């Protein structure tokens, strides 16, 4: 509806007439569209229902229902005196509220962030779609604040939490820290739930205060698997596939596929490099020298061969959006017969792939590339630890020594090219939680970003860059990964934060990749480096997916997308 309404607004504003009824009839608008077009044509309008009916000359059926629908969806606002207006004209904005564990929240309204004190949340929960009135006065730090006026749509029907006895009744403490504590359980619902058990409760929004009633017992709060189950239920993660989807996947996985139309790379030595606990293998790499150029091959599993547009599998994958990795399980986006089967590049098994072939000169500059359908047979599954042994020269296999000599040399050259281009490297410390055999966390392990990790990162970035360039040059409608330049206000705050760390700042703009790199290089051996990285990250815009290619600030690239995972 929105693109149509935008076009309608432009047309109405270009017409030199006040006869809204004739305009609406000429444009053949629905009742809701006609009402909204009336206000969009004259944004300052404050009309009663009778005045709206008069303006539209009674030409539209069910006007009352249309107006109420617009109010419920947040496109119109019912103000004092039962007058209707566009919300933004009254300083009211709609969007998804985010609530911190402290109870305070915020809402993004365009480029502006409206801070909301816990006293002004008005019963909204984290993730709800709300309408927020922005206050005219600003708080300290020149931040704008506001109050939730109404909840347009609830983000959840229930929650997981620990059941507690409270006097003669029961309460539930949600596992999600952004939700309010001590939510009352309806008295009749606590009889089959005991103290300290984890339960899933359905929420009751009908009263003035939030209440719940227990729907299912999940397990003991002393059970790690029950705690994971509570997270699955709390986020409404679909942990099972329908029989129809499973049957479709199994049928496709067992069907033979043809090599016709694919370039055969099965004789090219190919490896995968993944974490030691990886459950599936999405990408593989090969390299060879052709006419004095290094020819890098990045192979990606050809999932589209099995998952066609608008099929049952495609619909299910869209609903799930991603695979979810939990301590004791994976909830895959596709059934395991695909995700962990024919779409996983297992060693010594033929697999259909899409291959990005990139040629690099002796300096590491890309001179040519192509994208082709292919077939590969991975020769070896390697972990990062194994790959690192060959990167630092301690590996024992002669064939792999030669292979990593070429791979490592190209990766080093790509590092130099990226440095010269002005890429911003914000690599910070990464830690992984380790679990004991009983399922409880046993400690943290520092993940070292060594040359093996860097090699895969470099090669995947180059493949993504090549595919993005191809899509841009071919004018294809795709989602790019864009990262806009920082705004001036965040640069001022960053300068203050870096100064507080004792960093000597150069004159001029600091939101320049070369300047930021020099600052971080100066903190290379300092314990303050991770904090500086955190400050810089907070000052930058978030990288997002967009059909509009505006470039990638952090990578200093004119086009970038996620072709690889």
Feature-to-residue mapping (PLM):
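Hydrophobic alpha-helical signal peptides and transmembrane signal-/tail-anchor segments
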Residues: 1-5
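Charge-lined substrate channels and their catalytic hotspots, especially those that engage the 3′ end
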Residues: 6-300, 304-349, 381-382, 389
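Electropositive polyanion-binding surfaces
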Residues: 54, 195, 206, 224, ...
